[in-house]
From Swiss-Prot:
Single biological process term from Gene Ontology: ribosomal large subunit assembly
InterPro entries, A to Z: Ribosomal_bL20 (IPR005813), Ribosomal_protein_bL20_C (IPR035566)
Signal peptide: none
Native organism: Anaeromyxobacter dehalogenans (strain 2CP-C)
Protein name: Large ribosomal subunit protein bL20
Amino acid sequence: MRVKKGFKARRRRNRVLKLAKGFRGRRKNCYRRANQAVERALNYSTRDRRLKRREFRALWIVRINAAARQNGTTYSKLVAALRKAGVEIDRKILADLALALPGDFAAIVKTAQA
């Protein structure tokens, strides 16, 4: 009896086409093009999850440095002073404070410098 592997192949193709939903042109409905596009997209998403962490950390550092300079110090001096004072606030929280609550950020800078 001949076995045509219909169910398995159809399920595999449908899975790929479902992942390709939202793509433009033949990449959304032609299996071969969709498969290539989905594979590339998954590779990029893996790479960019790591890049996202780096980019956010750099953004936080830029924001903290700008706020620190408004308070008469620099980023590196502020971080060293915070560590020496035993203040354990991460860069994400510091950047949010610098942006949303500049007064509280200034108080933290004074605490670190004291």
